[in-house]
UniProtKB/Swiss-Prot annotation:
Pfam families: DUF2462 (PF09495). May have a potential role in hypercalcemia of malignancy. Residues 25-39 have a biased composition (Basic residues). InterPro entries: UPF0390. It comes from Mus musculus. It comes from the Eukaryota. Residues 1-40 are annotated as: Disordered. Belongs to the UPF0390 family. Residues 7-18 have a biased composition (Low complexity). The gene is D8Ertd738e. This is Leydig cell tumor 10 kDa protein homolog.
Amino acid sequence: MAQGQRKFQAQKPKSKAAAAERSRGPRKGGRVIAPKKARVVQQQKLKKSLEVGIRKKIEHDVVMKASSSLPKRLALLKGASKKSEATIPGKTPS
């Protein structure tokens, strides 16, 4: 047996968020370790910006193609955020 008392007793987290974080357990999926070398960081930043640009260009091309073939004007809708979905007035949670 160990001698003496433990220095720090285990305590419950003070906030609900911290308690939920602790009880959640391990997350699914692989982990990516951020690179330390400046050149690799710069390459990843460039890659990400290029991917975003390519995705936006493809979306724009699809919208233009669809709007040119439709008789009525095409309107794009933004996806609702999680907070606005939870607090829609007049709707009851089911």
